[in-house]
């Protein structure tokens, strides 16, 4: 293992000892804020340090076995050869585990998200496909026990959506969906196509982590134009009698967000402000992410909205993710919510990128 990684592990071991002492300190115990913060850090550091101690024990076993290779007894030497082989294999596995545990964690992985799906080229067929994508993510959310809440929708004339915005709430939503941002292309024969010709349409997907209070960008109220209007969304007759829907324009950036699904104007405004904050955060971080991706030539993770990331080919029942050259002939299962079949290889590729960077 590289000296730089061993140094990191030594620092973590020292920190673990500090945390153990701090969590037993009466002054810390009486301060619940500090106690919770130290407890969270302890929970993160403890498994890494435990594995590092195991690595040290196995390293000691290897040195002992190597010493026995010089024993005058041939039986002992034969046993030592086998033990050296086994302990070396153990060391390789433990080092790989430790490297994965040392990978930098994305602080947004545990967050809820704003999911934006927009029809692109292809007219009505693109809008219908937007509906298919939204249904796919909704079913995936059901499988994972997440909650999906539509904030804004603009339905297509023949079904689907010209645009649909939703908030997805649950455990590690961003960590799972963060590589879904980009252009999704569909190839199929539209129902209105009498000649049976395959048409190509596209939709764009954006996945934005919902910021917490510490992350939220401070927005000057003078930079906002707030419009109210009558909602055309869900909620029955009541919503059409009051101007409960909210549209907020951030004048410096030109970003517009709107929320129309709640009956309460106050709730719609709160959701819209949270979404605006997420979009402003995304604007800041996207440029940095693109620069890093370009510099390191990452296959996954640039998050460029215009990048074609996936093709759904209906005649062949095929899904292809172009970033990792993944092709699956299980289109129906993926669209039914089995998105993990695509997401897991992407996450594995991203982890491989990180491991390569860790070793640089």
UniProtKB/Swiss-Prot annotation:
Belongs to the prokaryotic/mitochondrial release factor family. This is Peptide chain release factor 1. Gene3D superfamilies: 3.30.160.20, 3.30.70.1660, 6.10.140.1950. The lineage of its organism: Bacteria, Pseudomonadati, Pseudomonadota, Gammaproteobacteria, Pseudomonadales. The keyword Protein biosynthesis applies. Pfam families: PCRF, RF-1. GO terms for molecular function: translation release factor activity, codon specific. Keywords: Cytoplasm, Methylation, Protein biosynthesis. Its main location: cytoplasm. The modification N5-methylglutamine is found at residue 237. The keyword Cytoplasm applies. It comes from the Bacteria. Peptide chain release factor 1 directs the termination of translation in response to the peptide chain termination codons UAG and UAA. Methylated by PrmC. Methylation increases the termination efficiency of RF1. The gene is prfA. It is found in: Cytoplasm. It comes from Pseudomonas syringae pv. tomato (strain ATCC BAA-871 / DC3000). SMART domains: PCRF. GO terms for cellular component: cytoplasm.
